[in-house]
Amino acid sequence: DYVLIESTYGDRFHGERPDYVNKIATVLNDTFSKGGNVVIPSFAVGRTQEMLYFLRIIKKEKMVKNYPNFEVYVDSPLAIEATNIFNKNVTECFDDETKELINKGINPLQFEGLKLSVSSNESIAINQNKVPKVILSASGMCEAGRIRHHLKHNLWKPNSTILFVGYQAVGTLGRSIIEGATTVKLFGEEIAVKAKIETLKGISGHGDQKQLISWLEAM
């Protein structure tokens, strides 16, 4: 028999997991205090659900002091559908810690202030709302999808933050932004990059060497 697996991090170990919740909370506090939005380009499957998990904790622990009732918009039909699949397939999609929450009647991906934008009209309305907010949208590398509209509306604002939570491949719009581009082209327009650019270091959906070997040993 043969087993074919991915091995992106097969030659290394991830090390201690950073405190992503506190990092995100810091970004939210800093940005909301200036009246801006936090725009998060996010992969629709896996990464968006992980961000929702973190954001639920931030809300529950009231970690955003001056704006605790902030709204979170998920603006990606695929991400919304994937989230529904996660919720319907608990045993396959969640780890033991998350299953414990579910057993207590807590949905780890739901919280007050979460808004799901399915239609194009709902998507457009997000940027007409001037209240500080979190916008989760795909694609994660900003090459396509609704995220490009949110970048167009927020990149030029010095009080907003673009928070990257995934790998940005060479040649992508996301890579250009994190490498310090001062302008980018969106929908035929040159958009100045004035927003604060942040990244979550070390976050990955790929298992490291230990995790890959553990998975193989269980077969």
Identify the function of each model-found stretch.
Residues 1-219:
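Acidic/His-rich, metal-assisted hydrolase cores and their charged scaffolds
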